[in-house]
């Protein structure tokens, strides 16, 4: 449970914490903190020519690899609101989600955090997408022009998602 590495004392009463299978617990005040998968919301924006927009990551992990546009959903944020926020932050354009492509489990970062990843297809607002935030480059790819798996982020996750997208575009 790498998520709780370094957790020794209770944030409420400062007494020692005890580790359980997927949580830390304080025997003094009863505080319990459970480990949960982090939720992500990502977009596969499509254009009128049937292409998909991918983002080249500008940060670790997987800096320089191709990824879907998106990121982590904030605490208490609806996944669709997080999706729209992330797409706007990374492309400068609003996103209209059309269809939930799928939900996949993944891992993120040096602490190997479990993630629950939601992917939508849809359209960007008119305009030219501009890379921003943690994106180094944005590029449109046709179904037969997708980057090879070795150039994709997150050890098979993005490749699996793009295969699902490509199956919708024979």
Residue ranges and their predicted role:
Residues 1-6, 15-21:
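Short, flexible, mixed-charge glycine/proline-rich loop motifs
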Residues 1-7, 130-170:
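Nudix hydrolase/Nudix homology domain
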Residues 19-20, 94-103:
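A short coil-to-beta-strand element that immediately follows conserved catalytic motifs
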């Amino acid at each position: 449970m790498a998520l709780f590495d370094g957790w020794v004392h209770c944030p409420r009463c400062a007494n020692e914490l005890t580790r359980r299978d997927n949580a830390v617990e304080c025997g003094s005040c009863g505080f319990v903190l459970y480990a949960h998968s982090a939720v992500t919301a990502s977009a596969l924006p499509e254009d009128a020519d049937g292409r998909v927009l991918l983002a080249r990551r500008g940060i670790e992990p997987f800096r320089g690899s191709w990824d879907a546009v998106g990121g982590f959903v904030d605490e208490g944020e609806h996944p669709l609101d997080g999706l729209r926020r992330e797409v706007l932050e990374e492309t400068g354009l609003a996103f209209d989600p059309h269809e939930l492509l799928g939900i996949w489990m993944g891992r993120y970062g040096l602490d190997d955090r479990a993630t629950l990843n939601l992917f939508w297809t849809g359209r960007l607002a008119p305009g030219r997408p501009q890379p921003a935030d943690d994106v180094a480059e944005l590029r449109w790819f046709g179904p037969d022009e997708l980057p090879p798996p070795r150039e994709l982020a997150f050890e098979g996750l993005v490749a699996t998602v793009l295969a699902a997208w490509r199956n919708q575009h024979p």
